[in-house]
Each structure stands twice: as structure tokens, then as C-alpha cells.
């Protein structure tokens, strides 16, 4: 064989890159749209990356409203588009027929879209690796390129806006995976066994450790045991066709007037396609009329409206198994239950709330991994003696902790990968408790890794709260725009007091 050779730098062609950190006073999405339009006006082939499908469509709509001449020359792009639509956009972008595209992470890698001159990042992508991957879409023909990172009113974004040196000093993160995640294994094993059957004693797959999953797959008809009893193979020829690489969950097809216009899966079905929800697709607006859970379909009608919708959610957490314990810090298996209870209608241009509507939908539940902090019963008295809101302090601390976790992990982790819930009185334990959990079925090891750096994690949370000059809490420190309870209650000063109490008895590492 040949000797290995270390490749420790990129050999890809690249010009100079001019990086701008933009922290607007007003809406960061409006600023991102204006920056994108400015680049187009200057003749720069441009791409804008957003952090959600809804913002992708909103920015596209705002751009076309502000500059109708760009219609047909710019497109939105995201998961949920039909395959033929995505291929057409990719081809038009590569050929130069399109001057720009507004995309989710769907165009971050894996698709050749040619050389671009400008990249607008509508929010910190969640990791250093993703930031440079997206920025790397520009300057591939050795021309200079501009990258504009627009800070959202979000704790992690504002941390880097205040500490740009920390951003540029950071290396690419490690990838955190959990190879024993049962939800992933149930999809992976049939695919693997369709290529090469599983054999008892295999050095790649520990069939003894995988026995419970293999048995379940046999029972459901996805795996078949060979006559010798020591091999297993897939019952389907192409099981990978049934697996979504973007997440775990059944795909629902979206129809308008009998025509299929898109698809959606996972928890997004309830959050973005409930009756009354506004579904945005390539600048067009549709109102969801029916969510058919039995036939995995969503029916909507096109509408011309001046608002969009945001789901209101509730959640509960149940302790299934305590695996690790150190003083008041615990880690183990949790079951989380989520429900969409209603939705806000918001003005399209200003994002102001118009009104609120209730909805009746089933809940969805998944088991995961997480940690929980049991707080002393006297802490409530200490907080309230200072005329502060105890429940608001717990809630604010939970938000700050979720935002801060990616900072000390040095692992690929976005705050959207983590969930949390706080209880002034937790029914299973009675004392107050705060839970932080992996936002994926079965868990992927994020919170477990967080335990290893819990001292740094708490310090990062404190820095996010205390660095922000606001008095009562804002989106830059303890508010979360995606909070299911609408950031109510929140108390920034109480969060600082609670954090200091927790730090007093939490070891640097567990």
C-alpha cells in the first residue's frame, strides 16, 4: 500500500475575502435583505443564507416587493421544494442565469453552484465550520469576495458581535455523534444490510449489542434472518429510499388545488402546517386548510395576505432513568412531550403580533438524553426577598444556558439542537428543576459532552447575560424568538442570582 499523506490546508482556488460584521439597530432580516439587494445592484452574484425555511421565503418576498426587477433573476431555495424545482434552481445558478439565491443550509454543501461574489449570512449559522463552509461558496474563481455576517437579536450572535476576536480565533468544531442511537440504528441497519448482510461476530457491527434493535427490525419485517441463524439481510432492495437524511419522521406531501407543491416532515408538520398556518413557497402564500394525519397529506389554498404565522407550543419532561449523578447535577434518559396549542399571526413587514388563535392537535413525544439541575427549595425565598420573579429567573437562565452551550463545547452544535424546560416546582422531584436536553430522538451526546465542561458552560451563560447592557432582558441575552411560551415570564436579574447560586455548588467538571 501507499503511505498516508497529511492534508492540513485547503488547496481550493480562492481569492481574498472581506468579512463584515453587521449588527443593525432594527430588524436583522430587513438589514440582510437590504444588504443582499445592494450586492445585486452592484452586479455581484450573491447568495444569502438563513436559519429557517420561513425566513428564506420572507426575505425572498421582501426582496421582490422592494425590487420587482429581480423577479426571475433571484430564487429562494430550501428543503421541502420538489426535486425537479431544486435541480432547476441549481442549474440556473450554475449557468449564471440567476444573479442570486436565498437559501437555508440546503445549499451549504454537496451542490456545485459555480462562482459567487457575495455571501450574506442572516444570522450566525451555529458553528464555525458552517460559517466558513457557507462563506466558501464565494471567491472560487480567485476573485475577491465579500461576506457579511448579520447579527440576529440572539444571545450567541450578539456574543460574537461583541467578541469578534473570539470568532476568528476558533477552530472548526468536532462532530458529536452517538453510534448507539436506536432511532438512527433502526434506519441505518436495514440500509447497511441491503449492501452487505450482517453476520454474527462481525468486527464492524456488534450484533450482540445490536440484538434488541435487530429483533425489533425482524418483528417489523424490515430484516430477515438467514437459514444458518447467524446472518441478517434487508427485506427491501432499496431501504435507503425510505430514509430522510434531514431528520427522523414521516414525510407529508403538501397540495394546493390538487397540485403537489412541496413536502414537510418531523415536528415541522405540527409547527408549520397546522390548520390556519401560512405556508410560504417561492414567494407565494398558502393557508393550510387541512392536516390529514392518516394519509400524510396537507391541503392548502393560495392567498394574498399581509401576515405570516408562528406556532405557540408547550412541553413537558419526564425522567426515565438517572444514569449519572453528582451533587445536584444529574444526567440520563428523558421523555419529552410537545404540543402546538395555538399560533400568532404577525405582520409580514414589521413582524408585529396581530392576534392569537388556538388549535387542537395531538402531541408528539420522543425519548432523549439530557441533564437536570435540582435547585434548593430555599432559592425561591432568596430570589423573592430581592423582589424578583423566581419562575422568570429559571426561564431566563434556561434560555441563556441553551444559547451558551455551543461556546465551550467546541463541537458542531446549534442552539436549535438543544431543548430546555424549567419548573418552579417539578412534580417528579418537588424541588425546582431545570432541564436541558438533546433535541433529537434517542439523544446524540451533546448534553453529556456539556457535563464535561459544565464550569465553562455556566461561565459562558453568565457572560451572555452580564455582557448585555439591557436592564430587563432582551433577545440578545435571555429572550428566545422561538420560545413556545412567548418569553413569559422572564427575569434577567433573577437569572443572574440563580446562576451564581448554581455555580457555588457545581464542580468545574463531572
PLM features: residue spans?
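Acidic, low-complexity intrinsically disordered tails
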Residues: 501-510
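Cys/His-rich metal-chelating microdomains
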Residues: 480
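Short, non-ligating residues that shape and space the ligands of small metal-coordination modules
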Residues: 483-484
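Short, glycine- and charge-enriched coil/turn segments that flank and shape catalytic ligand pockets
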Residues: 68-70, 384-385, 508-509
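Helicase motor core with emphasis on the C-terminal RecA-like subdomain
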Residues: 1-198, 202-239, 248-249
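Extended Lys/Arg-rich polyanion-binding regions
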Residues: 145-147, 153-171, 188-200, 210, ...
Amino acid at each position: 500500500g501507499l503511505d498516508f499523506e497529511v492534508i492540513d490546508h485547503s488547496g481550493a482556488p480562492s481569492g481574498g475575502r472581506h468579512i463584515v460584521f453587521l449588527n443593525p439597530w432594527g430588524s436583522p432580516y430587513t438589514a440582510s435583505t437590504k444588504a443582499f439587494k445592494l450586492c445585486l445592484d452592484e452586479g455581484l452574484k450573491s447568495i444569502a443564507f438563513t436559519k429557517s425555511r420561513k425566513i428564506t421565503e420572507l426575505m425572498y418576498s421582501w426582496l421582490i416587493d422592494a425590487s420587482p426587477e429581480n423577479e426571475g433573476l433571484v430564487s429562494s431555495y430550501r428543503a421541502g421544494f420538489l426535486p425537479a424545482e431544486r435541480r432547476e434552481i441549481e442549474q440556473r445558478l450554475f449557468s449564471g442565469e440567476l444573479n442570486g439565491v436565498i437559501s437555508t443550509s440546503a445549499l451549504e454543501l454537496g451542490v456545485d453552484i459555480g462562482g459567487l461574489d457575495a455571501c450574506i449570512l442572516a444570522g450566525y449559522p451555529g458553528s464555525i465550520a458552517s460559517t466558513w463552509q457557507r462563506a466558501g461558496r464565494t471567491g472560487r474563481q480567485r476573485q475577491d469576495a465579500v461576506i457579511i455576517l448579520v447579527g440576529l437579536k440572539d444571545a450567541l450572535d450578539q456574543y460574537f458581535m461583541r467578541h469578534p476576536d473570539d470568532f476568528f480565533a476558533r477552530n472548526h468544531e468536532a462532530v458529536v455523534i452517538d453510534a448507539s442511537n436506536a432511532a438512527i440504528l433502526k434506519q441505518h441497519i436495514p440500509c447497511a444490510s441491503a449492501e452487505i448482510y450482517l453476520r454474527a461476530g462481525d468486527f464492524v457491527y456488534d450484533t450482540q449489542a445490536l440484538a434488541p434493535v435487530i429483533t425489533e427490525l425482524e418483528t417489523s419485517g424490515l430484516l430477515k434472518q438467514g437459514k444458518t441463524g447467524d446472518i441478517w439481510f434487508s427485506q427491501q432492495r432499496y431501504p435507503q429510499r425510505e430514509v430522510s437524511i434531514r431528520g427522523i419522521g414521516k414525510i407529508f406531501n403538501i397540495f394546493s388545488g390538487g397540485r403537489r407543491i412541496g413536502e414537510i416532515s418531523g415536528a415541522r408538520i405540527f409547527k408549520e402546517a397546522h390548520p390556519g398556518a401560512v405556508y410560504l413557497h417561492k414567494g407565494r402564500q398558502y393557508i393550510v386548510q387541512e392536516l390529514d394525519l392518516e394519509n400524510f397529506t396537507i391541503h392548502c389554498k393560495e392567498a394574498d395576505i399581509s401576515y405570516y404565522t408562528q406556532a405557540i407550543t408547550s412541553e413537558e419532561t419526564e425522567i426515565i432513568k438517572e444514569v449519572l449523578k453528582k451533587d445536584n447535577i444529574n444526567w440520563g434518559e428523558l421523555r419529552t412531550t410537545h404540543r402546538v396549542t395555538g399560533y400568532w399571526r404577525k405582520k409580514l413587514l414589521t413582524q408585529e403580533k396581530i392576534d392569537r388563535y388556538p388549535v387542537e392537535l395531538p402531541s408528539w413525544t420522543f425519548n432523549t438524553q439530557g441533564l437536570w439541575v435540582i435547585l434548593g427549595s430555599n432559592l425561591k425565598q432568596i430570589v423573592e426577598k430581592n423582589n424578583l420573579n423566581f419562575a422568570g429567573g429559571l426561564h431566563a437562565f434556561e434560555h441563556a444556558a441553551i444559547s451558551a452551550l455551543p461556546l465551550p463545547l467546541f463541537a458542531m452544535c446549534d442552539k436549535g439542537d438543544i431543548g430546555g424546560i424549567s419548573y418552579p416546582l417539578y412534580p417528579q422531584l418537588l424541588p425546582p428543576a431545570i432541564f436541558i436536553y438533546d433535541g433529537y430522538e434517542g439523544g446524540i451526546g451533546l448534553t453529556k459532552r456539556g457535563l464535561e465542561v459544565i464550569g465553562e458552560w455556566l461561565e459562558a451563560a453568565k457572560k451572555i447575560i452580564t455582557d448585555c447592557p439591557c436592564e430587563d432582558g432582551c433577545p440578545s441575552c435571555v429572550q428566545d424568538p422561538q420560545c413556545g411560551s412567548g418569553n413569559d415570564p422572564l427575569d434577567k436579574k433573577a437569572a443572574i442570582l440563580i446562576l451564581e447560586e448554581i455555580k457555588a455548588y457545581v464542580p468545574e467538571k463531572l
